[in-house]
UniProtKB/Swiss-Prot annotation:
Heterotetramer of two alpha chains and two beta chains. Disulfide bonds: none annotated. Involved in oxygen transport from the lung to the various peripheral tissues. O2 binds at H59. Red blood cells. Heme b binds at H88. Residues 2-142 form the Globin domain. GO terms for cellular component: blood microparticle; haptoglobin-hemoglobin complex; hemoglobin complex. This is Hemoglobin subunit alpha-1. The lineage of its organism: Eukaryota, Metazoa, Chordata, Craniata, Vertebrata. It comes from Hylobates lar. GO terms for molecular function: haptoglobin binding; heme binding; iron ion binding; organic acid binding; oxygen binding; oxygen carrier activity; peroxidase activity. The gene is HBA1. Belongs to the globin family. Keywords: Heme, Iron, Metal-binding, Oxygen transport, Transport.
Length: 142
């Protein structure tokens, strides 16, 4: 999915507002995903998935850091996320549908924390951005 210049501006502005809360939002989105889509828990059998778990917080930070990297390299996400794509495709073997589920939960989390900034245009841009990230992460599944 091609991001327009306006989309890139919206994504950078929205992610900039996330700032120091990125890890917390990542963890919240993961918790939301585990509650809303319980089958996603199968990829984390070794995690304590309870609310506020240090393991969920740690993985939420990894998710947020990867998205921060993608925002910083929005014009070259395939190279920026190459190692992460390899990891999810070849070692973790995460079903690609789960990226869509987490993307949805991230959008809900961002909208809940930043309702004034979460305009329809920003929502659409973030949705396109997360779809692009998902596409990159699943590109090595073939």
């Amino acid at each position: 999915m091609v991001l327009s210049p306006a989309d890139k501006t919206n994504v950078k502005a929205a992610w900039g507002k996330v700032g120091a809360h990125a890890g917390d939002y990542g963890a919240e989105a993961l918790e939301r995903m585990f509650l809303s889509f319980p089958t996603t828990k199968t990829y984390f059998p070794h995690f304590d998935l309870s609310h506020g778990s240090a393991q969920v917080k740690g993985h939420g930070k990894k998710v947020a850091d990867a998205l921060t990297n993608a925002v910083a390299h929005v014009d070259d996400m395939p190279n920026a996320l190459s190692a992460l794509s390899d990891l999810h495709a070849h070692k973790l073997r995460v079903d690609p549908v789960n990226f869509k589920l987490l993307s949805h939960c991230l959008l809900v989390t961002l909208a809940a924390h930043h309702p004034a900034e979460f305009t329809p245009a920003v929502h659409a841009s973030l949705d396109k951005f997360l779809a692009s990230v998902s596409t990159v992460l699943t590109s090595k599944y073939r």
